[in-house]
A protein has these predicted regions:
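Short loop-to-beta-strand entry elements in the cores of soluble alpha/beta enzymes
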Residues: 61-63, 83-94, 107-133, 151-162, ...
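Conserved NAD(P)+-binding/catalytic subdomain of aldehyde/semialdehyde dehydrogenases
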Residues: 29-118
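Flexible, glycine/charged-enriched surface loops at secondary-structure junctions
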Residues: 57, 80, 117-122, 142-154, ...
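C-terminal core of ALDH-fold dehydrogenases
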Residues: 175-288
Length: 288
């Protein structure tokens, strides 16, 4: 967990290893004056309440496990947050033109995140579906201990391969799932790009993969999960912009605005609201 609060950062170390030098270097490049060796719920508490002599945060941003998500939910209101994110998800839309080996690798690549990370394949090709269902367990078995354990549990409990009749059916099912990460590996890439509406981030063509978005290509990987892609997108720069509204009117404008306010308020049964318009109409000579 790397968190920026003004010029302070919280960095989670790795048991028995410590903080990776590359992370410390990155923090320095970002202008950190203070680095706290904290992660998870402890870091969230420290940032929210301004512990250890540091200023409290106005906003908490970033992914984490279920404890981090619950902490952000509890503290939402005292501080702003980006979104409530559940376990990471991947879906792949693939037809007979897709490379089944790439599809299998990509599904395993995201299942590695944790035991409850869904991996879904929507395909019109039974041949590809059969290959992937055989190949994924082989790829999982070849992983180191922890990734193998996570991927195996995720694929066993949350993996799905759905055989569809048409491209339209694949698109419809995908929009119903609204996956966090969605790959398209089909002949007609542009059609799916134009047709699909619900997802966190879209990866078009076999040349890209979800791991690129996670690690290095530049698209934000703090994304909606659990179907939230139906109503929101991922983190973007606008989340850090606070919009403020204001109004200033002339006395002459009160003739129309004050009268409209009074009428609307009375339709709603809010007499005190209406009278704030009436009193100005009288003061400025527009009403007896």
């Amino acid at each position: 967990l790397l968190c920026l609060v003004g010029s302070e950062m919280c960095i989670r170390d790795r048991p028995g290893i410590g903080v990776h030098p590359a992370i410390v270097y990155t923090a320095d490049l970002c202008g950190a004056d203070v680095i706290m060796n904290l992660g998870g719920v402890q870091a969230i508490a420290a940032m929210t309440y301004g512990l250890f002599g540091n200023a409290p945060a106005d906003m908490l941003v970033g992914p984490g496990n279920q404890f981090v998500a619950e902490s952000k939910r509890i503290l939402f209101g005292k501080v702003g947050i980006d979104l409530f994110a559940g376990p990471t998800e991947i879906a792949v839309i693939a037809d007979e033109t897709a490379d089944p080996e790439l599809v299998a690798f990509d599904l395993v690549g995201q299942a590695e995140h944790g035991y409850n990370s869904p991996a879904w394949l929507f395909t019109t090709s039974k041949k590809l579906a059969d290959y992937v269902m055989q190949r994924v367990p082989e790829l999982i078995a070849d992983l180191p201990d922890l990734p193998r354990e996570n991927s195996g549990a995720a694929w066993r409990d949350y993996g799905e391969v759905i055989l569809c009749d048409t491209d339209e059916e694949m698109a419809k099912i995908s929009d119903e799932y609204a996956p966090e990460h969605l790959e398209i590996q089909t002949k007609n890439l542009q059609w799916f790009h134009d047709r699909l509406k619900n997802y966190g981030s879209l990866f078009i063509g076999e040349e890209t993969t979800v791991a690129y978005g996670d690690k290095c290509s530049g698209t934000n990987h703090i994304l909606p999960t659990k179907g939230a892609g139906k109503y929101t997108g991922g983190l973007f720069v606008g989340k850090f912009i606070k919009t403020l509204s204001f109004q200033r009117m002339t006395k002459e404008s009160t003739k129309e605005v004050g009268a409209a306010c009074a009428r609307i308020s009375r339709y709603e049964g809010m007499e005190a609201h209406a009278r704030t318009g009436d009193v100005r109409l009288r003061k400025y000579g527009f009403q007896n």
